[in-house]
Each structure stands twice: as structure tokens, then as C-alpha cells.
Amino acid sequence: MSKRILILDDNQDILEIVHETLAYEKFDVKSTSNGEDVMPLVAEFNPNLVILDYRVAGINGGDLCKQIKCHPQYKDIPVIIFSAYINHDDELMGYGCDAIINKPFDLTELVDKVNGLIS
């Protein structure tokens, strides 16, 4: 059975590229551009990994990461945060994420991080 990945990014181009790249790598991928959709999708889709953009309209990826990591049922799901903010890694790690990928990023780096976290 394919590993499931949930992606949040409000940049449609990035969302599509990441979705297509991970689907090509044989992952079962769901994506959304709305932060309010994340927790219901986590409950419904039961992902093996979540990728969150740090800055999205409404609830940000850091706060969503905290919600996932504080929930008894979801706390062990690895979370990657995308960020365009260089030199904020300590702040981002404070949300409990398992990895940070700075934008712009290399798709090979993304796939390697994903594989490392869910293998």
C-alpha cells in the first residue's frame, strides 16, 4: 500500500509541482491550499507525512504543526514545514516539525527528506 502524504501550500504552482512529484514517486497524495482544511483531512486521509507551508492565509503552517503534534492520535505523524524565511529554523523547529525545507527548494531534496521521514 502506498504511503499517504498531505500537502498544504497556498501557491498553486508549488502545490501542483510537489503533488505531481510525490505522486510520480508512487505516494498517495492529497493537497489543499486552505489551512482550515488540514485537520479534517488529517482525520479523513490518515497521512503518513504532512507538508505544511509556513505562511498561508488564515491559520499558518506552524500552528497547524502544533495542532498535529499535540493531538494524541496524530502526534507521531512526521511534519515538514516549507519556509521562504531563511534563518528562522530555530523558530520553526519550536512548532515541533520534523524537518524544514527552505524555498526555493530542490525536488530531489524534498523526495529525499520525505523518504527519510517515512521509511
How should these model regions be labeled?
Residues S31-L49:
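Acidic, metal-coordinating helix/loop segments flanking the phosphotransfer/catalytic sites
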Residues F105-V114:
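C-terminal output helix
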Residues Q12-K30:
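Two-component/phosphorelay signaling modules centered on CheY-like receiver
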Residues S33-N34, N60-K66:
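Acidic catalytic/metal-coordinating carboxylates
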Residues D53:
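Active-site residues of response regulator receiver
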Residues V56:
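Receiver (REC) domain active-site loop signature in two-component systems and cognate sites
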